[in-house]
Structures are given as structure tokens and as C-alpha cells.
Amino acid sequence: MKAAVDHYEELIKILKDPEEAAAYLNAALEAGDERAFLLALKNVLAAQGGMTKISDRTKINRVSLYKMLSKNGNPGFKNILLLLKISGIHFRAIPRGTKTKTRLSHRS
């Protein structure tokens, strides 16, 4: 019998790749749901070593990071840009209709 797959752990492995992380965040942005984007960003940060490591790198208190990325969180744009930068993701505006990679790769 095949062991059950821990989907969260598999997602975190995939999100360690900056291109996959960017595609994941783009998909969340395109969905137009702020909560979905914050959850996606939280998952990308988890793939980068977790909130303690991110807190050390950003000098933002770990508890504050959890609050700003919670379902009721409201991080400022400056903090979002900082968290993206720490994750190796560059934020830019592109014209509507431009194709972007929005799928995670399928791994076997």
C-alpha cells in the first residue's frame, strides 16, 4: 500500500524553487482574493525556512509576521514588498493580457 502524501509538505518542497513560488503567487494574485494571496505568501515564506528565519532577516517580529499573514491580516505594501524580496521574488506590473506562468509544475 502506498503511503499517504502530505500535500502541504509537497507544496513546501515545490515552493523552494523561486520560479514555482512566483507562479504560485501570480496565480493567487490573478484570483483577486487578498486572503488567497496572503496564504500563498505565507506558504512561500514557509518554504524559505519559516517565520523565525524570515523574522531574523526582515527584523519584523515573528508574531507580527503571523498576524499580518493571517486571514484577517492587513500587511502594508512596504511589508509585502520586503517579504517578496526576502523570498527572492520581484514584484512588477505588466499589461493586462500578458501571459504569465500560473501553474505549479507536475512532479512525479
Task: Cite the ranges covered by each PLM segment.
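N-terminal flexible/basic segments that precede or flank functional cores
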Residues: M1-N43, T100-R107
